[in-house]
Amino acid sequence: MSRYEVDGVDIQTLPKVSLHDHLDGGLRPQTILELGDEIGLELPASDAASLGAWFAAQSNSGSLPEYLKTFDITTAVMQTEHGLHRVAKEFVLDLAEDGVIYGEIRWAPEQHLQRGLTLDAAVEAVQAGVEEAIGLVASHGGRIRIGQLVSAMRHLDRADEIAQLALRHRDRGAVGFDIAGPEDGFPASRLQSAFDTLAKAHFPATVHAGEGAGIDSIADALYSARALRLGHGTRIAEDIVVEEETDEAIVVRLGQLAEWVKDRQITLEVSPSSNLQTGTIAQWGTALTDHPVDLLHQLGFCVTVNPDNRLQSGTTLTRELGLLVEAFEWDLDDLEQVTQNAAAGAFCSFDEYEELADEIADGFDDLR
């Protein structure tokens, strides 16, 4: 049982969908210790609890570049088939334990070639771990669906190659494409040819935008990359002007980009704790109650809630939802809405979506 409840219901027992969850940000500290020992990696702590605390402390910098440096350690232990397989398997098992029924694992294969793996071998190792975990969950009477989001690093020059990699594995685990890494100064349009290739192949893309940069980056992701979802997307709130606010109501004016994102129901992959750690919401404040996620949700944007990097943020999807219940007095209806939003944004077939949506509705109804 978790410590997070909504309307008397343990949030961990609710069916959940996780769209923005990085493989190299979801390792168990004990696994890092063991895999690190195998390769002689020097670590900042020698026990799991202390190592987990170190990651959390390092991640509370308020700077996205500093936050990203913690991945030097996690990716170091994910350079072999064995390491990738184990991390992927445990990643899925941890999602299932948290009540996730559909999850997408995003990761950048080009970051995992230091010990001789090929791009294809890396993707295959992750898929093998995913499938083993799905089988283990099923053997215990559970069910979880998982897809890979194959990411390219936006500041490097392998996006065309990674796009082709994603297409090669589209029927073997890969469900979408993403670009990650430092956002400011590296717009999606820099990788235009990769997105053109994907669009011509009818392969969906989500793009990190509205995290480390503002609305220009979001616009570029939508128009140049044809993004169906925005990784974070939080800073779309920069295009919303609050004209009047009382205890009973709030009057706002949406800019053209915000209107487009709302009217087209572009999925926002909001990650509350991560946004605090990286300074994404600094212009609005430094507390979770300052986060524009509630405003976006109340205005009818397609908000989803995600953990981003469970290790760095010391979090789970249950915790992220629970924090919003505490900060904004969200109820079961709010949690069901953002969960259904996530199901609608999932990179799965329409038939799979309908099944997923029914499972979510039934799961919430059973707990009311």
Could you tell me what each predicted segment is?
Residues M1-F203, E211-R229, R235-R368:
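Metal-cofactor-binding active-site regions of metalloenzymes
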